UniProtKB/Swiss-Prot annotation:
Domain of life per record: Bacteria
EC number: 3.1.-.-
SUPFAM superfamilies noted in UniProt: Ribonuclease H-like
Name of the featured protein: Putative pre-16S rRNA nuclease
GO biological processes: rRNA 5'-end processing
Species of the source: Burkholderia ambifaria (strain MC40-6)
Keywords per UniProt: Cytoplasm, Hydrolase, Nuclease, Ribosome biogenesis
SMART domains according to UniProt: YqgFc (SM00732)
InterPro entries referenced in this protein's UniProt entry, alphabetically: RNaseH-like_sf, YqgF, YqgF/RNaseH-like_dom, YqgF/RNaseH-like_dom_sf
Length: 149
């Protein structure tokens, strides 16, 4: 069998922000995701060097990018930037990109860190990676709702 099937794919999830990009890793077979790292979004060169290093290390089969929306589902000021980031990932690294509605990911991430008693600076530093985990987990949960084609 050549390559990983969609059922056991390794995935990287991204929560794109102007200052920071949260990254999570997940597996389609186990349907689980975990926060990985936060990349400072200093400039395009730094951003893609850091992403390239992660791709070399984790060798994902596909990427998931959170798409920020307003609560009513209309585009957010960050929607276009996140979409551009996903398109650049696809163009640069040749991996398929799926977008996931990330409307409540930061709220959920904040609550998850609070539940685990992560406080202060540690919470602030982990928040973006945890938001990426929430986004990726949402995608994985959708996979089990209707098996991946």
């Amino acid at each position: 069998m050549s390559g990983a099937s969609a059922r056991d794919a390794t995935l990287l999830g991204f929560d794109y922000g102007e200052k920071r990009i949260g990254v999570a890793i997940g597996n389609a077979l186990t349907r689980s995701a975990r926060a990985l790292v936060v990349i400072p979004n200093l400039n395009r060169e730094h951003r893609f060097k850091a992403v390239g290093d992660l791709l070399a290390e984790w060798r994902p089969d596909a990427l998931v990018v959170g798409l920020p929306m307003h609560p009513d589902g209309t585009p957010h000021e960050m929607t276009q930037q996140a979409k551009r980031f996903g398109n650049q990932l696809n163009g640069r690294f040749g991996l398929p990109v799926t977008w996931v509605d990330e409307r409540y990911s930061s709220v959920e991430a904040e609550a998850g860190l609070r539940e685990r008693n992560v406080r202060g600076r540690a919470r602030a530093e982990m928040l973006d990676a945890e938001a990426a985990r929430v986004i990726l987990q949402q995608y994985l949960d959708q996979l089990s709702d209707h098996e991946h084609h």
